[in-house]
């Protein structure tokens, strides 16, 4: 299955090669650093290209077999691209704040998601039985839950892959994924540790254009995997559902 094409030029165009100031580096990233320029580490994009391609292939293959991807990026410049990419590819996201136990205590989180859906149902129906104060309280509770859990409300269970922008900021999410054996694909800047990352992608994790580029590529890989999954399901169903198979191929 073809995956999105990542090139050295496309990475250079979005500034993926710029790391952090040399004094802020994590020595564990030394193998992925090309050198430094004016006190700034330069990432070795000759490694980034094949590593990124490998990660995209893994995501496509996993989704093609029915797997789910959880996009995680709570820093300001990642919030919108993370949500957009996940929604566009039919996947899931956390872009506000990682709640402790979001994966390792999934049963409790599932209860909170049920509460969110219950509140939405109440507020979208007849609210004549509630006072204005009660409606305001319910609305605030719903909005708070939506902010934290809206991106995973339909995930149903823990994901098969986690994609992370900024491994330092999302350290807790990565720890939970590691505990549960969920492979982590992560953008690794020069100031982070690659420990616990199954699919490292050494690159700038701060530049807005770069972050959107990574998210778009991951989304495209997931979308291609989903298309293959739908196509294969259609073929398995046989001639009786030929129109569905044709629709999946469209």
UniProtKB/Swiss-Prot annotation:
One of its GO terms (cellular component) is cytosolic small ribosomal subunit. One of its GO terms (biological process) is translation. The keyword Ribosomal protein applies. It comes from the Bacteria. Keywords: Ribonucleoprotein, Ribosomal protein. One of its GO terms (molecular function) is structural constituent of ribosome. Residues 239-250 have a biased composition (Low complexity). CDD domains: RPS2. Pfam families: Ribosomal_S2. Residues 226-250 are annotated as: Disordered. Belongs to the universal ribosomal protein uS2 family. This is Small ribosomal subunit protein uS2. The lineage of its organism: Bacteria, Pseudomonadati, Pseudomonadota, Alphaproteobacteria, Sphingomonadales.
